[in-house]
């Protein structure tokens, strides 16, 4: 990943964090889940480790170049889902391929 892409990604992660926080005080009913934004980008683990946000490689087959994005998500039910979806929409708006990994407990 080149320096320009890295800077763009850092700004996009800050924007995603802000977008998610808009739902921080929303209703948190529903089932427990581990929904998390995911971004697809070619980068090394060393590059991603230097970001201000914790980003962890998804090691599963079919998830090539995908990374879990651990921005602060509050709650464990529908609030967490809304926050993860808002973060993913923000990453997409900033030009990255992103989505949400949905997992219920």
Segments from the language model and where they lie:
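N-terminal leader/targeting segments
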Residues: 1-57, 62
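Short, compact, well-ordered microdomains
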Residues: 67-105
């Amino acid at each position: 990943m080149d320096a320009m892409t890295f800077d763009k990604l850092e700004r996009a992660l800050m924007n995603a964090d802000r977008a998610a926080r808009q739902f921080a005080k929303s209703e948190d009913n529903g089932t427990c889940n581990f929904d998390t934004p995911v971004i697809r980008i070619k980068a090394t683990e060393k590059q991603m480790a230097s970001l201000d946000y914790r980003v962890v490689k998804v090691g599963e087959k079919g998830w090539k170049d995908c990374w879990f994005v651990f921005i602060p998500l509050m709650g464990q039910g529908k609030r967490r889902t809304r926050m993860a979806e808002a973060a993913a929409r923000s990453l997409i708006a900033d030009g990255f391929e992103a989505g949400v990994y949905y997992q219920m407990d």
